[in-house]
Amino acid sequence: MVQIIDGKALAQKMQAALAKKVESLKAEKGIVPGLVVILVGDNPASQVYVRNKERAALAAGFKSETVRLSDSVCQEELIELIEQYNQDDTIHGILVQLPLPHHINDKSIILAIDPKKDVDGFHPMNTGHLWSGRPNMVPCTPAGIMEMFHDYGIELEGKNAVIVGRSNIVGKPMAQLLLDKNATVTLTHSRTRRLADICRRADILIVAIGQGHFITKEFVKEGAVVIDVGMNRDVNGRLIGDVAFDEVSELASMITPVPGGVGPMTITMLLEQTYQAALRRVSQ
């Protein structure tokens, strides 16, 4: 019988514990972790993500600000706004919601964020810390997946881990985090040949490609742990993952659902990293 990895329940448990830590920090040091999320344009999916982040931040006792900008805002104006929050001592985490309009360069915006406040973990300084084995701010989705492995007692050392998708947001940082735990990692992508054969060798299969139900049972060996990062809509508007959940569940030993799997953990790690940034600020 397959075991469901319940990211929603784990996220609720972690956020409740985080709220207590925030309360203690406020009582002992007079510090409230501050998070600002900047949303450019009216992308419907981005608006949902931002609302969820704001709701979770407020529930955990954070100072939460959301700045909504027109998609006509110029890059210089956005960088100027980021610089204001870089200098604001009440803000410990800055997140610019991606994707951005085409006329704004993502890399320039990420570079503009103070690495100490880069709670998304995308700044080159933070990725450098990750690649050198000294992670500080880590992209939130891979960080959340690592927490799931820990909470569910999933052994990583010596295991074959296959990641489908090589993005800077999930695939690449996920690979490094697994390497740090002594897993043997294969990072695959759209040009990978004989993908199904490679995936069938995985003890741990992590899928983040943005194609609904792409991974079927032909890609999965019996007893594998399957982590589905995908968030897609089917023809009826229903939220589905990159993994064909029903048929893959027949083979997997453990699997994350969509929704209710990885997504809630991503938001939880965003809050955790903002809290840790506030702690570091106190110790300076």
Swiss-Prot record:
The enzyme's E.C. designation: 1.5.1.5, 3.5.4.9
Matches recorded under InterPro entries: Aminoacid_DH-like_N_sf (IPR046346), NAD(P)-bd_dom_sf (IPR036291), THF_DH/CycHdrlase (IPR000672), THF_DH/CycHdrlase_cat_dom (IPR020630), THF_DH/CycHdrlase_CS (IPR020867), THF_DH/CycHdrlase_NAD-bd_dom (IPR020631)
UniProt-annotated binding residues for NADP(+): 165-167, 190
Protein name, entry field: Bifunctional protein FolD
Keywords: Amino-acid biosynthesis, Histidine biosynthesis, Hydrolase, Methionine biosynthesis, Multifunctional enzyme, NADP, One-carbon metabolism, Oxidoreductase, Purine biosynthesis
Superkingdom, natural source: Bacteria
Catalysed transformations (reactions): (6R)-5,10-methylene-5,6,7,8-tetrahydrofolate + NADP(+) = (6R)-5,10-methenyltetrahydrofolate + NADPH; (6R)-5,10-methenyltetrahydrofolate + H2O = (6R)-10-formyltetrahydrofolate + H(+)
Segments passing through the bilayer: none
Any one annotated GO CC term: cytosol
Molecular function GO labels: methenyltetrahydrofolate cyclohydrolase activity; methylenetetrahydrofolate dehydrogenase (NADP+) activity
Name of the gene: folD
